[in-house]
UniProtKB/Swiss-Prot annotation:
5-amino-6-(D-ribitylamino)uracil binds at F22, A56, F57, E58, T80, V81, I82, F113. Keywords: Riboflavin biosynthesis, Transferase. It comes from Actinobacillus pleuropneumoniae serotype 3 (strain JL03). It catalyses: (2S)-2-hydroxy-3-oxobutyl phosphate + 5-amino-6-(D-ribitylamino)uracil = 6,7-dimethyl-8-(1-D-ribityl)lumazine + phosphate + 2 H2O + H(+). (2S)-2-hydroxy-3-oxobutyl phosphate binds at S85, T86, R127. This is 6,7-dimethyl-8-ribityllumazine synthase. GO terms for molecular function: 6,7-dimethyl-8-ribityllumazine synthase activity. Catalyzes the formation of 6,7-dimethyl-8-ribityllumazine by condensation of 5-amino-6-(D-ribitylamino)uracil with 3,4-dihydroxy-2-butanone 4-phosphate. This is the penultimate step in the biosynthesis of riboflavin. It comes from the Bacteria.
Amino acid sequence: MAKITGNLVATGLKFGIVTARFNDFINDKLLSGAIDTLVRHGADENNIDTAWVPGAFEIPLVAKKMATSGKYDAVICLGTVIRGSTTHYDYVCNEAAKGIGAVALETGVPVIFGVLTTENIEQAIERAGTKAGNKGSECALGAIEIVNVLKAI
């Protein structure tokens, strides 16, 4: 029985990152964490392109454009949606998640879901580089690993 795993070497890989501007004080930290992790694992900064979109709802469209361009080994999607007093949160979270997942399945390109969906601002801050780690960094690791798993198959 073969065990297929992916290493964490990003040398020679190209990444697209789609980041939402809404809640950018959190998303800037997610983006920095992702880029830092990609570079630490061998990616060349010149092989990392970033696109900014208005909010999490708009991420899937740009992720799909990147995924179908043939330029990227993986696309990382970063954003933050914080629950408010209306149901808007539910719609944005659900559609962003569905859209991002659909892009990966439709294109065969790894598309990593790095949209924080939190109950409050404190939870978002915790996941952007404080006590709960940096989810942008974790998404970058996931992107590297899944690209290498797919190459090994």
